[in-house]
Amino acid sequence: MIRRLSTGLLAVVLLLYPFLVYWGVHRGELTLLGGGLILLFGLRLLPVGGRLGEWLWLGRSMAGCGLLLALVSLVCRASHWLLYYPVLVSLLLLLLFARSLWQPQTLIERLARLQDPALPAEAIRYTRGVTQVWCGFFVVNGTLALTTVLLGDMALWSLYNGLLSYLLMGTLMGGEWLLRRRLQARLATSTLEAQP
């Protein structure tokens, strides 16, 4: 129960993270903000049952990075450490997706096989391409997130990391979904034409 509640609360906090950091920095509430983040990220690191998969690895890695940044921020009394969290999240996602390019099935292919275990060769090539596109997205997103940190403009940092990066991600997801629907329709048509 506590684990489920902390996971849900952490998801909300992660979505609102840029705005919470902006609020905490401008209100001088670093102790409250840092303490709250340490508590939430710490709860996310608690052991859970089941198999340790890549999604659990990702969640724990993100929580570990968040915990470390919050601790350093509190100890050094320097809020700028908190600004690096979106950069590290993009880096972790890049590692997860890129690593799968050297495995028999990419991450996107494994997700696609949850809906259709018998993917045709063209769909497998497509999922590899989508995985590569996501890798490119995480490189660009991480670079832009780092740029907002280095520019030192909290409003710009909050705007990009709290809104624009999500809009870019949603646009990529939506565009990929439309492209996938076209591919599925084309594959269905070619399958029907191939039948005697």
Protein language model annotation of sequence segments:
Residues 1-10:
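N-terminal membrane topogenic signal
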Residues 11, 15-18, 38-42, 64-71, ...:
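Hydrophobic alpha-helical transmembrane segments of multipass integral membrane proteins
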Residues 18-31, 45-51:
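Short, hydrophobic transmembrane alpha-helix segments
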Residues 24-37, 163-166:
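Structural signature of hydrophobic alpha-helical transmembrane segments
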Residues 48-90, 146:
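Long, highly hydrophobic alpha-helical transmembrane signal-anchor segments
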Residues 50-59, 80-84, 103-115, 179-187:
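A cytosolic-side transmembrane-helix exit/cap motif
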Residues 77-128:
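Membrane-proximal helix-loop-helix units in multi-pass membrane proteins
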Residues 117-196:
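C-terminal membrane-adjacent module
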